[in-house]
């Protein structure tokens, strides 16, 4: 029986996305995230009851490596990369690293124990595909089986993207989802009434996973997934373009986004740590967009821009 090595890194939740990327880059076959915040604060907003969980700013990110991996070298590299992230201003927190061996059948499903149904916005709830869930009246359920290499839809950057889509979409829109990952934003767009959604990702694995997740959800035949490098070569105009990726990548798509967004349409940009906020704002303003909404959760920012001639109540351009 093949065994796997499990490495758990305890960091501040604001570093979740960056640290997950570090773990994948060091050879992990996937990551699982345990965050008490996924269960805290939902009761007051939506009236549901959740288990009592002690809230902490720290989260546990567990990575899985083949048994042949030199774990000492991997852990040394992880510590070096985390120190570098901290030097860039990202709030990493007090880092601790644990490791253990894991049998293959445990590795295959171990990450699932951290993944529970989560009410993300007023209308949208993300539910693991293997979970039976009774939706309440008006509740829109997104079924996901992201695998270990993709987020479960509960990261602040995803939450803010979903909230923005819920506020903007009224039915009949064309949406472009750049860097679709698990496909969660495309699925949400369909459930919120968008007529047609085009989802792009540079990663072939993401394209496959997104399509598999789309197939889990009824009424999502209007989502078209394809490999693509941001918006290069795209000619389809859209009412809404949404991208939840790193800030350094977001600044590369603002000009193409302005070309493709229809008049009075929207550009939603998320995945922006506070230190990179001005850089993204400058790129979007230079492209011609006006800022309509700025959302903040911890160190993360999401921005909603509009392509308009009516500049009352908006900033930039």
Curated annotation (Swiss-Prot):
GO terms for cellular component: cytoplasm. Keywords: Cytoplasm, Methyltransferase, S-adenosyl-L-methionine, Transferase. S-adenosyl-L-methionine binds at residues 158, 179, 201, 244. It is found in: Cytoplasm. InterPro entries: Ribosomal_L11_MeTrfase_PrmA, Ribosomal_PrmA_MeTrfase, SAM-dependent_MTases_sf. It catalyses: L-lysyl-[protein] + 3 S-adenosyl-L-methionine = N(6),N(6),N(6)-trimethyl-L-lysyl-[protein] + 3 S-adenosyl-L-homocysteine + 3 H(+). Pfam families: PrmA. GO terms for biological process: methylation. Its EC number is 2.1.1.-. HAMAP family: Methyltr_PrmA (MF_00735). This is Ribosomal protein L11 methyltransferase. It comes from Streptococcus pyogenes serotype M18 (strain MGAS8232).
